[in-house]
């Protein structure tokens, strides 16, 4: 039977969980070094799917675990690994997930961070279960001087991997771009997942005046800042890399319960329904939008009937105020129609440009509104970034 998420639980979760997981394997994150991977390899830390437990699963090295688990340490020191973020950016928080590690979780952890100008050539290949770092690997990683990286999370006591204690949320206040983190566990043990929540930070200095850029993309600093419903998939999935792998890699809402018993359509073939769902994104850089892509890939029996896109320009203070009010309708921004309501198709890539779009000038935020409900796998907002001077003149 499904477990209902109560409102109290939702409110107690930190806000940074709405941001993007910059280290997820689907975003290009990878573990480039680990001191020890005897029971389970460190690459498992970055899996997108939730951890699982199979009671009967064993390997020749011991109990199979869906995470990173080191051997019981019998030499001086502690275990650690280095994660290369798939999307460099500003980190706002971590989820150190100990799911299913109940008698074997790492009791303490700390995290360090840095921004490297060049990506190191260090890499871990293949299944490393039952292995430890070799002397040559230790020698290579020593060149990174990771022990002197900035400590963004001090040594922190972790909780066991039971359902009510497994998520160890760690907020961060570090306003600098990060490319790599060093994840330290003390002295040894297991961690199921490590999620690095933040916002991508792109160098826009060389982009102005060039080709169109996907202003909302995860890699370009786009971020979801509000939504009405995320029952089956978070809206942030829509700005991920490449095409969606499946429905779970997109945004899907629950079925609205206010749907009419008998559905009717207007002269344009769009269903007349009282309700809708929405998701709001801050663009990675303000810009003038000239093309929009809406992809319902994989959504065949559950795509929205229609979709529209709205846009506006907000200051940081205005955005924070609206987030605090959860974008309530009585304090909503002045949204302008960018893309009028469009009839959607199943499992289809919809592209809109030219006369299909309404010129709104430079904008910083977009709102997708779907009716009555359903799922979309990808959102692309193509445009040309504008300077801060152009935005100020508009405001």
Swiss-Prot record:
Catalytic reaction(s) noted: allantoate + H2O = (S)-ureidoglycolate + urea
Record's function text: Utilization of purines as secondary nitrogen sources, when primary sources are limiting.
Pathway per the UniProt entry: Nitrogen metabolism; (S)-allantoin degradation; (S)-ureidoglycolate from allantoate (aminidohydrolase route): step 1/1
Pfam families in the record: Allantoicase (PF03561)
An individual GO BP term: allantoin catabolic process
EC number: 3.5.3.4
UniProt name for this protein: Allantoicase
Gene: allc
UniProt cross-references to Gene3D superfamilies, sorted A to Z: Galactose-binding domain-like
Enzyme class: hydrolase
Taxonomic lineage of the native organism: Eukaryota, Metazoa, Chordata, Craniata, Vertebrata
NCBIfam families: allantoicase
